[in-house]
Every structure is written in C-alpha cells, then in structure tokens.
C-alpha cells in the first residue's frame, strides 16, 4: 500500500534530574556540595533512508518518545546524555507541525537529518548553586521537559517529470513503454490511484525519473476527487508533461481538457505554472484524432508546441523523450519550502518560544490559572520536596512579575492559584 500522509506524535527525552549531595570523606573536613548535573535528554531526529518509498511503517507506530537523560550522581558526577532517537523517513518527506502548520523540515537527500523534537537539558545539581553566602545549598533542578508535538508527514514523490491529465488519457501506458515501470492499466477511470515512478533512458546516455500521477478532474485544487493528494506529488517535478486524449472517445473536447487541467495547476499552486510544460497529443492512432488535433492547434495557437504520439504504437515517443531531457537539463529545481541553510546535511529546526511570558485567567470558582511556556518549564524543573527549592521558585515567580500581575487581577491572601494540574494558596 502506498501511504503518503500520516500524523504522528514525537517527544524529546526529558533531561535528567540534578542531585543534592555532599562530600563526606576522610581528610576533607569542608567537603561542600557535590551533586552532579543530570544528562541531556535525547532528541527525536528524522533521517532520510533512500531505500524507503512510502510512509507505510508509520501506520503501525505513531508514537516516538526519546529516552530521558541520566540523573546526576554524588561526587560531582554528571548524568550521561541519552542517545538520540533516529526515525527513518523516505526521500521527499515534508514534516509539518500539526498545530501551527509550520514547515519543520523538507527532507530530500539520503542521510539528511533534522531535529524534530529537542530533548530537555539536564537539571543542575546543588554544587551549581553554591555561593559565598550559601556554601551548602539544598537545591537541585529537575530535568527540563523534552519538546513534544504532533506532526504531519507528507510524502511528495521525487521525480524530474510528472505526467498530468484527465483519467484514462494514456499516462500509465506512456510510462510503461518508456520505462520498466508496470503501472496498472485498464479501461476505467482512476485505474492509477497512487504515483508510479519509472526511470526513462533516452538512448543518448541521458536518463530521468518520470512519475505517472493519478488523473485530475475539475475542482482537484479544492480537493475534489482526492485532488490534494494527487496534486501534492507534482510540486517537486521540474517538467510537466500534459497528456491529452486526442481521440475524443470519452466524449470530451481536447481543448477543454487542456484548459481545465491548467486551471487546476494554477489554482493549486502558482509555482506549478512556472515549470515548462510539454503538451502531448496521445492516441493519434485512433479515428478522428488527426481532425481533433488540427482543431486543437487552432485554439491554442502556434506558441504551444505539441507532440503528437501514440503510446500504444510508440509513434512520436522518441522525439518526446529528447525534448523532455533537454528541458530537464536547462530547468533548475523548484524548492517547495524555504528552510534553513542546507549547506550542512544536518539541520536544526528550533522551537520558537518567544511571545507572552505568562498568562493569567480566572475560572468560574475564582481560581487563578497561570499558563505560559516559561513559567510551566520553571515549575516542572523545580523540586518541591525541598524547602529551599520552593523558596527559589517563589523568587522566580516574583522576578517574572507574576505576583504583581496576580495582585492587579484582584488576588488576595488565601486565593487558589493553579499551574498545570497543581494548586496552591496565594500569600500576599
């Protein structure tokens, strides 16, 4: 089964917790704090594997959670960083954040990697908090939570040439005679429901990859007839071969077919119209095809170059392949998305946390709810089993301006304040 879109959940590993410890050794009368830092949590890293062709594997495993870092230890020993979780994807995979729609990565070349969910940093041990006024701190941090998100994976086939046109115009037949591909061919519409790829050799030491894409119908750009799933695969192609049934046996006018398909390409993505398009008049071995071709030429004008062929008899196919190969040599690639500098095959896509530091809302029962990335991260990294850590958290809240903001919202002694699933009393 060809699977070209799937939703999965990824989570970077939490950082290891820092430790509260002290040196208790002979001849070390003032040993001091010796708690080590926690190790960094593992990242979730997507890596391109050229042997993969679909996203089928993700139908059976949709959750990817990286390991947390090792906890800090006594004698100042830091926890070990966890090994990154490598997730293999096929070439041509686009990764989007499900919530925001942001493009996280466009993975096209073998071995290319992208960090999709960062692991959290390790919490600091108490040796990090020693000062002249507090030489033996009872403070250690929990590990930072790893980033988590739902992502959408879309596979857009990597082909130099895309065959487009209405259903049953002969795209699959053409691919089968110019390559070793064996797409399903039958006398009914939408025989092809997934892209088929074939390597085409022109006979003069040139070759390219051609994709037979499922047939389009009017309204495809808006999703009619699974149009979005089909048009998605055209985006990476450099040359579009527009196949038209010149026999008219389906009862459609070839010129109207030509106009309709081009409108769909334009409406779906303006950049599709920037690609060179080769117009192929297929089924020229059928009755009335020559007459229909002349009428078609009169309507499109002389500026549109047309290649009359018969995919069944292979008439005109050789000239068509040479023209396509020439266009590929002179046409640059069309990048789909603007991503980070690709000079390095390893790309880091950072999690944007800029914006509102915290937000205060009030529930119907009068409870004040504090939310926001910074305050929630600080809360999770606080070890509430130690009084000194609790006092430090209170200072951090004041430093963020949360105390003042609560007072401004009318908070008084004894009011309930909630962060995540935890509640405590406000003390003025």
Curated annotation (Swiss-Prot):
Keyword line: Cytoplasm, GTP-binding, Hydrolase, Magnesium, Metal-binding, Nucleotide-binding
Question: Where does this protein hold Mg(2+)?
Answer: 172, 192
Q: Does the keyword Nucleotide-binding apply?
A: yes
- EC number from the UniProt entry: 3.6.5.-
Which Gene3D superfamilies does the record associate with it? GTP-binding protein OBG, C-terminal domain, GTP1/OBG domain, P-loop containing nucleotide triphosphate hydrolases
- Cofactor annotation: Mg(2+)
Q: Where does GTP bind?
A: 165-172, 190-194, 212-215, 282-285, 310-312
Principal localization reads: cytoplasm
Gene Ontology molecular-function annotations: GTP binding; GTPase activity; magnesium ion binding
An annotated GO BP: ribosome biogenesis
- All residue ranges annotated as the OBG-type G domain in the record: 159-329
> What HAMAP family does the record tag this protein with?
GTPase_Obg
Q: What does this protein do?
A: An essential GTPase which binds GTP, GDP and possibly (p)ppGpp with moderate affinity, with high nucleotide exchange rates and a fairly low GTP hydrolysis rate. Plays a role in control of the cell cycle, stress response, ribosome biogenesis and in those bacteria that undergo differentiation, in morphogenesis control.
Summarize subunit and interaction data from the UniProt record for this chain: Monomer.
Q: What is this protein called?
A: GTPase Obg
**Species this chain originates from:** Bacillus cereus (strain B4264)
């Amino acid at each position: 089964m060809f699977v070209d879109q799937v939703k999965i959940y990824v989570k970077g590993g939490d950082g290891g917790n820092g430790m509260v410890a002290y040196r208790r050794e002979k001849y070390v009368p003032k040993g001091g704090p010796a708690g080590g830092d926690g190790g960094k949590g593992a990242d979730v890293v997507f890596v391109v594997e050229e042997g993969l062709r679909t996203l089928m594997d993700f139908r059976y495993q949709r959750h990817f959670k990286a390991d947390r870092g090792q906890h800090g230890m006594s004698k100042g020993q830091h926890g070990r960083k966890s090994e990154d979780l490598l997730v293999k994807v096929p070439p041509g995979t686009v990764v989007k954040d499900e919530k925001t729609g942001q493009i996280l990565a466009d993975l096209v070349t073998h071995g290319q990697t992208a960090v999709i969910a960062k692991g959290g940093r390790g919490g600091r041990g108490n040796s990090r908090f020693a000062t002249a006024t507090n030489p033996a701190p009872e403070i250690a941090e929990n590990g930072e939570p790893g980033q988590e998100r739902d992502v959408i994976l879309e596979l857009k086939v990597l082909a130099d040439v895309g065959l487009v046109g209405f259903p049953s115009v002969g795209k699959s037949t053409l691919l089968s005679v110019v390559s070793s591909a064996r797409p399903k061919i039958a006398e009914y519409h939408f025989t092809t429901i997934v892209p088929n790829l074939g390597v085409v050799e022109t006979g003069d030491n040139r070759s390219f990859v051609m994709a037979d894409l499922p047939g389009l119908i009017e309204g495809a750009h808006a999703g009619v007839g699974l149009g979005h799933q089909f048009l998605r695969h055209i985006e990476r192609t450099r040359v579009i071969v527009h196949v038209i049934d010149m026999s008219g046996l389906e009862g459609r006018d070839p010129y109207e077919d030509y106009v309709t398909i081009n409108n769909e390409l334009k409406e779906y993505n303006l950049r599709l119209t920037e690609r060179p398009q080769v117009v192929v008049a297929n089924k020229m071995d059928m009755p009335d095809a020559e007459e229909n071709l002349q009428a078609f030429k009169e309507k499109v004008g002389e500026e549109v170059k047309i290649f009359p062929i018969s995919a069944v008899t292979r008439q005109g196919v050789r000239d068509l392949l040479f023209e396509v190969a020439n266009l590929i040599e002179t046409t640059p690639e069309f990048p789909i998305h603007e991503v980070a500098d690709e000079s390095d095959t390893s790309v880091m896509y950072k999690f944007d946390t800029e914006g509102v530091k915290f937000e205060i809302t009030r529930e119907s029962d009068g409870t004040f709810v504090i939310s926001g990335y910074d305050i929630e991260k600080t809360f999770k990294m606080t070890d509430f089993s130690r009084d000194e850590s609790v006092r430090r958290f209170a200072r951090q809240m004041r430093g963020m301006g949360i105390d003042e903001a609560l007072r401004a919202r009318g908070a008084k002694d004894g009011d309930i304040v909630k962060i995540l699933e935890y509640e405590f009393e406000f003390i003025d």
